[in-house]
Amino acid sequence: MTSLKCCKAKTYLTDTEETGMIDTKKEQERDELHRAIWAIADELRGAVDGWDFKNYVLGTMFYRYISENLCNYINRGEIEAGNAGFDFAKMPDEDAEEAREGLVEEKGFFILPSELFCNVRANAANDENLNETLERVFRHIEESAKGSEAESDFAGLFDDYDVNSNKLGSTVAKRNEKLVKLLNGVGEMNLGDVKDHSIDAFGDAYEYLMTMYASNAGKSGGEFFTPADVSELLTRLGTVGKTEINKVYDPACGSGSLLLKAEKILGKDAIRNGFYGQEINITTYNLCRINMFLHDVGFDKFDIACEDTLLSPQHWDDEPFELIVSNPPYSIKWAGDENPLLINDPRFAPAGVLAPKSKADMAFIMHSLSWLASNGTAAIVCFPGIMYRGGAEQKIRKYLVDNNYVDCVIQLPSNLFFGTSIATCIMVMKKNKADNKTLFIDATSECVKVTNNNKLTPENIDRIVDAFAKREEVEHFAHLANYEEVSGNDYNLSVSTYVEAEDTREKIDIVKLNAEIKEIVAREQVLRDEIDKIIAEIEVDE
């Protein structure tokens, strides 16, 4: 009876009010989680540089996640089958071995109960060989995927987690002491239960830590992580009018956060056939694969490769892609015309010229265009110089404009990225445009200053995306240029060529100014007359 009375007395909220409360609760949880996590991570590193220590914190988080993920998956199945109170973590290893083959097929990996995070952590303080234990556990996890479809997703995943590094301590005992603190620190992070948390705790915490490490690392951080606000803008530009995407691709995927943004914007099952990316740096490549797992992307739903995208692209069999988003490295060197094979490469050949050896930016543009689906959109962050420089880059721009591939160019504010204050821009490309015009958007003032960087607010992003979708003239903000206008400007794609900046100088009223000057001159004359009178009186007295 009591529960019924409670139900009658309950005040029901509207959907909007309830959603608002849930969103506020999520934000509060997220903020609390972030503060606690950074405090733990910062305390754990001690005297070790945060940038060097990131692989240990992030790797330990991953170890905890896959342990809990596997445990909950098995426990849920057993409990649903009527085996109440079952706990895989307490199962003898020899009994668990019987389930290895089936679990590898379903989950892509297997961990023995004794090697689960919770059990290794429980024994860590008393394990004089903890470094060897962890090394063995990580090796076993990687080996468990061998021969399965998930092999490439797990191979070398823990390579950057060096348990014998002097960064952890000068002796085995000191290193193990640090490893115990690592396990306990990550174990104490309030990441909730994998099967029951109100925010995407593991993935959210991982991305927060990467943001903090990237911002503290400056230039090095910018090479592997695109700020969340820029990722949001790129992905929204690429998904205007769409509720689902076939495949998403990033040719310079870094830690993978930009790739994952499409799922956050469109929804969990909106990326039908998965996430594809390539990254040249092996440490960052490992961070990206871990990021996929922590966001609960199945091993059969992502394909991340570690190679030079321009010289050795790994996804020929997977292209074309409906959505391509990327923040490739700015103006790096590449082989260019030193490699005679590249001019005949189907990705670069159509332009008839290669990007300069000292500036590979246009090579990434051509690569992305080549692998773009006919119904797709590519949104690429670009160094501003490629929009106006002459030579080979101008010829490539001519090819892009003549063939009506450039849909929009957006000038971004300066100082949005970690480690560089450059005001970058975005080039949006499509293969089946509805018109032969190019939209130019000047978003240089669409930001707010946060500590040392500028940031795009949700309102800033909305305004840019809205202008992009409407393709209308907006004074001092957006201009829709036809082909003749662009070609007449020698294929210059700089936004400042097409969008006149607003004159923010104070307008001067000449009539009013002249009147003020006349008044000042008259007043000056009165003062002079008074001074002359005083001097004359002094002279008379003498």
What is the predicted function of each stretch?
Residues 43, 185, 189, 208, ...:
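Conserved, well-folded catalytic cores of nucleic-acid-processing
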Residues 220-326, 331-333, 337-342, 347-352, ...:
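Conserved S-adenosyl-L-methionine
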